[in-house]
Amino acid sequence: MLYIMRHGKTDWNEQYRLQGRTDIPLNEEGIRMAQEAAVKYKEIPFDICFVSPLLRARKTAELLLAGRKVDIVPDDRLQEISFGKYEGTRNVFQHPECPIYNFFQDPTHYRAVDGAESYEELFARTGEFLQEKVMPLLAEDKTVLIVGHGAMNNSIISRLRGIPLERFWETAIPNCELIQV
């Protein structure tokens, strides 16, 4: 069984800033969300947790699994997509001239520029991670948890459910919510 969770809230989430690989910590609400998720999902018998090395995801996993004997294993391939020089940009949804606008509004026409990562690069690294780490565990009937980020999580969900790129954002997971894939 595979479960996926998005990290708790950060100040940049609340300010509608692109986080990407910028290492932003959870804010007080994000900490509370992760603690509440720990209670809500305490009955799920996770065997292992893979997590992005970024602080907001690591802290979410630590709070979620506090007091449980579940290994938390960071993997660089679970980092959020890089938005390059556009990280920190506010309200990209209101700026069609910004190259990152299509990332959210029209994924099939998104072109990575200025140090940003492409969808192809994102799918390549998360696909490799799935094949190398997750699929063998699922074949052994293990219960696997991934704690990550919006786009990174969606790339895994899209791959496993066969969702085309134009529908990439239909599976968005709210902060600290858990889905079963």
Each predicted region: which residue ranges?
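Glycine-rich phosphate-binding loop signature in dinucleotide/nucleotide-binding domains
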Residues: 42-45, 133-142
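Short beta-strand scaffold positions
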Residues: 51-52, 124, 147-148
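Short active-site segment of divalent metal-dependent hydrolases/proteases
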Residues: 10, 152-153
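Phosphate-handling substructures
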Residues: 67-125
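Active-site-proximal alpha-helix that buttresses catalytic centers in soluble enzyme cores
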Residues: 9-68
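Domain-level recognition of soluble alpha/beta enzyme cores
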Residues: 161-181
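Extreme N-terminal starter segment of soluble prokaryotic enzymes
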Residues: 1-3, 48
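Generic beta-sheet signal
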Residues: 2, 142-150
